[in-house]
């Protein structure tokens, strides 16, 4: 058992009982989502966070990155690379990218719940996986050149 256990019932309470997110699901831009789908996403992500992402927390904390000043290169522990790969291979990066770039349209509150699990299990992975978030900002607020760069960032 790793250091992190996601409290999915607490997240469910906050999303649906406290914030009433169910009222916006099934409508407008969230027409393809319902409570069961959102909870399925959260449950699947819980498994990823508690296992694949949390697995590299200790290595990332104790060993960290190594910077070689002579070459300008940075080396990550292999376990961090493996955790990051699991996150990207599961296509969870899509939750932070705009729909126009292949992102998943979900309520911000659901994105925050997923981010909470990443941050709790391994904050370093959250930082390494912020590229799509930056692409989102560049795509939504940037010039035509910025939008082109944003597309490259998620490819």
Positions of predicted regions on the chain:
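Phosphate/diphosphate-binding loops
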Residues: 135-136, 141-155
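Amphipathic, small/basic residue-rich leader segments at the start of a protein or domain
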Residues: 1-125
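Contiguous, well-ordered alpha-helical segments that form the cores/surfaces of helical PPI scaffolds
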Residues: 112-116, 132-140
């Amino acid at each position: 058992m790793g250091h992190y256990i996601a409290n999915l019932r607490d997240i469910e309470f906050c999303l649906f009982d406290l914030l009433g997110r169910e009222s916006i699901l099934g409508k407008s831009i969230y027409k393809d989502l319902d409570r069961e789908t959102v909870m399925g996403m959260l449950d699947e992500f819980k498994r990823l966070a508690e296992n694949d992402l949390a697995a590299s927390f200790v290595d990332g904390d104790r060993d960290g990155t190594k910077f070689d000043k002579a070459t300008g290169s940075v080396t990550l522990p292999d376990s961090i690379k493996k955790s990051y790969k699991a996150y990207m291979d599961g296509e969870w990066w899509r939750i932070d990218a705009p729909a126009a770039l292949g992102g998943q349209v979900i309520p911000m509150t659901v994105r925050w719940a997923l981010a909470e699990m990443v941050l709790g299990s391994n904050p370093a992975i959250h930082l390494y996986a912020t590229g799509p978030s930056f692409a989102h900002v560049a795509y939504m607020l940037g010039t035509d050149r910025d939008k082109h760069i944003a597309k490259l960032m998620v490819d």
